[in-house]
Amino acid sequence: MRELDAINLTLEALGESRVMDINTSNPSAGLARSALARNRRGLLSTGFWFNVVEREVTPTADGFIKVPWNQLAVYDAGSDSKYGVRDGNLYDLMEQNQYFDSPVKLKIVLDLDFEDLPEHAAMWVANYTTAQVYLNDLGGDSNYANYAQEAERYKSMVLREHLRNQRFSTSKTRFARRIRRARFMV
């Protein structure tokens, strides 16, 4: 789904005309676009299979690690350290400094453009935004409920796909190993 299509979905719900360009002077389109961006960042900040990457980064000669990614969050993937970003550099929150002498393994939650989202995630954001803008402008009625229900349907599809991509397995648990080792008596 394109960002323009998501904006037009919101405009049609409000009973307004579609726009042909994303950079229009229509105030409702601007409202829809800002709500779409806010909800997109809210969705992505959770971290899903499509916007979480793990990287090992090496500090430069002066000890800094530049953070070139358009990230929403940075987590440690190798130890119990806590990291943040300060002035474009990785910052160790535990040690309170930004100087590193060894490579660091990071888990990075990326901020993706709307067009780069998987279809179900884009539809989730578009319908959630439509429901939210509709509720703020026209109040809650059956149309609002329909958009909210559609958003929940796409949300469940995204969560199902996320779970599938995580490859969780109960066969790797301690309880499953106990069952495999057990001797069954007949």
UniProtKB/Swiss-Prot annotation:
User: Which superkingdom is the protein from?
Assistant: Viruses
Q: What class of enzyme is it?
A: hydrolase
What UniProt keywords are attached to this protein's entry? Degradation of host capsule during virus entry, Degradation of host cell envelope components during virus entry, Glycosidase, Host-virus interaction, Hydrolase, Viral attachment to host adhesion receptor, Viral attachment to host cell, Virion, Virus entry into host cell
The main place the protein resides is virion
Gene this chain is encoded by? 44
State what this protein does. Structural component of the tail, which functions as a receptor binding protein (RBP) and mediates the attachment to the host capsular exopolysaccharides. Displays a depolymerase activity that specifically degrades the polysaccharides of Klebsiella pneumoniae capsule, which allows the phage to reach the host cell membrane and bind the entry receptor. Hydrolyzes trehalose.
Reactions that this protein is recorded to catalyse: alpha,alpha-trehalose + H2O = alpha-D-glucose + beta-D-glucose
Q: List the EC numbers from the record.
A: 3.2.1.28
Record's family?
A: Belongs to the tail tubular protein gp11 family.
- Which InterPro entries does the UniProt entry name for this protein? Tail_Gp11 (IPR033767)
Pfam family, any one: Tube
- Supply the name of the protein: Tail tubular protein A
Query: Which organism does this sequence originate in?
Result: Klebsiella phage KP34 (Bacteriophage KP34)
Q: Which GO terms describe its cellular component?
A: virion component
The terms under GO molecular function for this entry are:
hydrolase activity, acting on glycosyl bonds
* Gene Ontology terms: biological process: adhesion receptor-mediated virion attachment to host cell; symbiont entry into host cell via disruption of host cell envelope; symbiont entry into host cell via disruption of host cell glycocalyx
Q: Where in the cell is it found?
A: Virion
